[in-house]
Amino acid sequence: MIQVLLVTLCLAAFPYQGSSIILESGNVNDYEVVYPRKVTPVPRGAVQPKYEDAMQYEFKVNGEPVVLHLEKNKGLFSEDYSETHYSPDGREITTYPLVEDHCYYHGRIENDADSTASISACNGLKGHFKLQGEMYLIEPLELSDSEAHAVYKYENVEKEDEAPKMCGVTQNWESYEPIKKAFQLNLTPEQQGFPQRYVELVIVADHRMNTKYNGDSDKIRQWVHQIVNTINEIYRPLNIRFALVGLEIWSNQDLITVTSVSHDTLASFGNWRETDLLRRQRHDNAQLLTAIDFDGDTVGLAYVGGMCQLKHSTGVIQDHSAINLLVALTMAHELGHNLGMNHDGNQCHCGANSCVMPSVLSDQPSKLFSDCSKKDYQTFLPVNNPQCILNKPLRTDTASTPVSGNELLEA
């Protein structure tokens, strides 16, 4: 009995390293099993919410202890956030989730100034963090021990498809004047000339997405929430906040013709947004998330400079990877087009091997905007004057997962 107890204690104290495992993100060639320990202090007598505004976790990476600091992404959901799906006979059903705790966080690693993190704490810790310049993924292991998590480098995930992933936007590059040195300095977004802007966002998951996730709306919901949480992290340096005001799942059938021709699908989706969605859902921008395989290497398409326009404030995104970060980066890229950003040319730099806006999406994920993207956005604001992103959305510190039954409202 004593020997068994000692073994259990050792497993909890020291990470286990494995050579290969199949995880949600795919086949992983090298990983560690870790046991994150929550170390957030709670004042004596205080009522502890399920998901605090700030949390800290300790665990080991490569044998070295790390402390992950997390802060809740307040304002991730608007106060009037809604979800819509369709009954088998085609009736539109909209729910308004109760306003309570949510479990999506941004964060950093202690003593690493360049670290970042985007984490879901809904069921264990799931997401990604940057540590000492390398991207790591973390997710709970489906073991009897509910505290066990896998941590692994992004580069150790076997790629499902070696073909390059591309944006379908075509653009003629312009030569840019040298960017002011303010972009290289440790200045606030306001000091760099980025006024606070708010984008009220609707995500639509098409019928193929519903089929891909076996009609499990919870999985689709969590997948989308993680995407938008990461998008907020990416756009924080530009002082842009994305508030999710609606999630619509085409659970019965597609409401437009979704084809492998991305330009046709984008045009149809833009028309549908103008004639249907805008009539019943207040929002600034809509993105279609589809499980169709677009022709060629295209995984996304959007209208350049279309933000706040009735038809053109849209994009279409292929759900092309089992790694949530990669799909989030694709959507962040297409939203960049909506905000006036062109593709990066060779003269564009962000201090990393790749940036957010290349025409060919890099196999080294980057959440940094180039100097060119920053200038494009700064030019877009006064020239296009997008009024819809000026207003602060109805926001709340927290939001919940949907409830059923008496919260169903037929439109």
Swiss-Prot record:
CDD domains on file: ZnMc_adamalysin_II_like
Organs and tissues of expression: Expressed by the venom gland.
Propeptide cleavage-removed residue intervals: 21-189
UniProt cofactor(s): Zn(2+)
PANTHER family (alphabetical): ADAM A DISINTEGRIN AND METALLOPROTEASE DOMAIN (PTHR11905), DISINTEGRIN AND METALLOPROTEINASE DOMAIN-CONTAINING PROTEIN 28 (PTHR11905:SF32)
Disulfide partners: C308-C388, C348-C372, C350-C355
Keyword Signal tagged: yes
Described function: Snake venom zinc metalloprotease that has fibrinolytic activity. The recombinant enzyme cleaves both alpha- and beta-chains of fibrinogen, but not the gamma-chain. The recombinant protein does not produce hemorrhage in mice. Cleaves the peptide substrate Abz-LVEALYQ-EDDnp at the Ala-Leu bond in vitro.
SUPFAM superfamilies per record: Metalloproteases ('zincins'), catalytic domain (SSF55486)
Positions bound to Zn(2+): H333, H337, H343
Name listed for the protein in its UniProt record: Snake venom metalloproteinase ACLF
Entries under InterPro entries matching the protein: MetalloPept_cat_dom_sf, Peptidase_M12B, Peptidase_M12B_N, Reprolysin_adamalysin
